[in-house]
Design a protein with these regions (language model features):
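Catalytic core of pol beta-like nucleotidyltransferases
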Residues: 1-29, 35-40, 50-103
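Short, aliphatic-rich beta-strand segments
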Residues: 44-47
Length: 103
């Protein structure tokens, strides 16, 4: 993670943890341009929301995306572990990911 984004994430860690706890997030990890680029235009997160009824899962997913976009003032993409079907994509995510929150 570049220094500017690291500072931004660290300064908002308490807010980030509160959002994750409130929405029942198990793990939240940053990957993609946010871990490589000096000034990423968007942020990519790998999120584990655990097992839930479909409506509750969808509500948590979209609420998390909205709150992260508001917190970091830029577009956010969320990927869940089942979305890592492509082995090349999965490998890239595994290499780049940085843990931000774990319940």
């Amino acid at each position: 993670m570049n220094a500017a984004l690291k500072s931004e994430v660290e300064s908002r860690h308490a807010e980030l943890a509160a959002i994750c706890a409130r929405l029942g997030v198990r793990r939240l990890e940053l990957f993609g341009s946010g871990t490589r680029s000096a000034a990423p235009r968007d942020l990519d997160f790998l999120v584990d929301l655990g097992e839930r009824p479909p409506a509750e899962y969808a509500a948590a997913y979209f609420a998390l995306r909205e709150e992260l976009e508001s917190l970091f003032a830029r577009p956010v993409d969320l990927v869940t572990p089942p979305g890592l079907q492509n082995p090349y994509f999965r490998q890239r995510v595994e290499q780049e990911k940085t843990l931000l929150y774990a319940a």
